[in-house]
Amino acid sequence: MKLLVTGAAGFIGSYFTRYWLEHHPADEVVTLDALTYAGVRATVEELAGHPRHRFIEGSICDAAVVGQAMAGCELVVHFAAETHVDRSITNAAPFLRTNVEGTHTMLRCAAQSGVRRFVHMSTDEVCGPIVEGAHTESGPLRPRSPYAASKAAGDLLVFAHQETYQLPAVIVRCTNVYGPRQLPEKFVPLSITNALEDRLLPIYG
């Protein structure tokens, strides 16, 4: 099988790519990443020359690039996104472009190319605060930041493409992930480093 992984130079995407290549020896993996500040070029360089991996540097907002990357792929795993809450509050424009326009481009190309499965990586931030009990898959979306709103819009675009174009898609809503190679600005490493340095811990909500 041939699959496309977007955002593969990012934290989760890079781990997923290495895992897939290791555990699916018959598969070919195409990765697409714009290599923004959040993309770690070293993760791409580690896979340079791998016989079953091909890297394309480009934006998910560019339909021509996406179409080239997606050609012949049966599975698309869409990690690419702007993901920092605080940055979205300062400047929401990149979040709207990547998380909404870029996701729409990905979905449109996937529907046209006839992929067998589109996996959209989202976030629990789209759900907002728990009013009562626990979040459910059918619960309302209550985004509380421009980042969360942009990801919620992406989720709704996925639902729309399922209904309108019968695109076989699933949404994965991650919560606070952490591990080696993560950017220090993210919540878990920031909390740990602040605690080690006797600085205030960030509290959201």
Where are these regions (language model features)?
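A short C-terminal helix-loop "cap" of Rossmann-like NAD(P)-dependent dehydrogenase/epimerase domains
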Residues: 49-50, 165-168, 192-203
